[in-house]
């Protein structure tokens, strides 16, 4: 039977298709991201998987930043081979390498900013321009930045990933992920999301909502602490500091 319309919006007739608690979290993140819609997944890597499988098909190619989060590399470089999906990597410090990697089979540009392993910052506007010029889909892992610092969909990306396990949660007691999308890719992601069953449970959604209440306070303190730690380590002769806000660094 048709589920009754919930007062806060939507039909809730089957838990895997959404609950009132996950709906509230989606609306909170939608406002933060300034996007068309936000999908919720059980883990951050679930959002990585969903973003790729929503738009990439056998015979397509992906261009990803090198290095990327190691599980993402394992997925793109190894696992996807069995689906006849090829991944090539570009140097995030030289976007000319990105342009040179594009072929007629290229479907998706996968970006991390900053990079998970070595914290490179990239010219995101230029990447978006390259993607649009070549009619490619674009996705960015924005876990480090979160929409508190960066709003990728507003900037021009098609999809934006955040591992809610990290800063959104803030208490090390919940796993989850979010995938913000624009209108262009909404139907692709919605279809894949329903079929794969990558849905966040209401209890986890509740804990993430709790964490979001202090997100700004925690990130401001993280920023202050990082500057102090970086300043200390920069004076250590046996430490190589990969910190983008250090004077003289490539990304300063």
Segments predicted by a language model, with ranges:
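Conserved PLP-binding catalytic core of the aspartate aminotransferase-like
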Residues: 241-252
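Conserved N-terminal alpha-helix of the aminotransferase class I/II PLP-enzyme fold
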Residues: 1-46, 74-78
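Conserved PLP-enzyme active-site core in the AAT-like
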Residues: 37-236, 248
């Amino acid at each position: 039977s048709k589920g009754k319309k919930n007062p806060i919006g939507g039909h809730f007739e089957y838990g895997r298709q959404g609950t009132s608690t996950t709906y509230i979290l989606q609306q909170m993140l939608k406002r933060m991201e300034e996007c068309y819609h936000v999908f919720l997944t059980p883990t951050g890597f679930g959002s990585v998987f969903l973003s790729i499988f929503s738009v990439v098909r056998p015979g397509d190619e992906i261009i990803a930043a090198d290095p990327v989060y190691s599980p993402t590399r394992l997925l793109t470089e190894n696992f996807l081979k069995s689906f006849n999906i090829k991944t090539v990597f570009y140097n995030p410090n030289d976007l000319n390498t990105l342009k040179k990697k594009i072929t007629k089979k290229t479907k998706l540009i996968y970006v991390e900013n900053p990079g998970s392993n070595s914290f490179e910052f990239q010219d995101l506007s230029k990447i978006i321009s390259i993607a649009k010029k070549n009619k490619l889909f674009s996705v960015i892992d924005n876990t480090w930045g979160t929409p508190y610092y960066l709003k990728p969909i507003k900037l021009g990306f098609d999809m934006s990933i955040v591992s809610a396990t990290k800063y959104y949660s803030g208490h090390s007691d919940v796993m989850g992920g979010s995938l913000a999308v624009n209108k262009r890719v909404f139907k692709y992601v919605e279809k894949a999301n329903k079929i794969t069953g990558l849905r966040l449970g209401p209890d986890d959604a509740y804990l993430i909502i709790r964490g979001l209440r202090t997100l700004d306070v925690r990130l401001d303190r993280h920023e202050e602490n990082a500057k102090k730690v970086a300043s200390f380590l920069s004076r250590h002769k046996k430490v190589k500091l990969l910190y983008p806000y250090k004077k003289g660094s490539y990304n300063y």
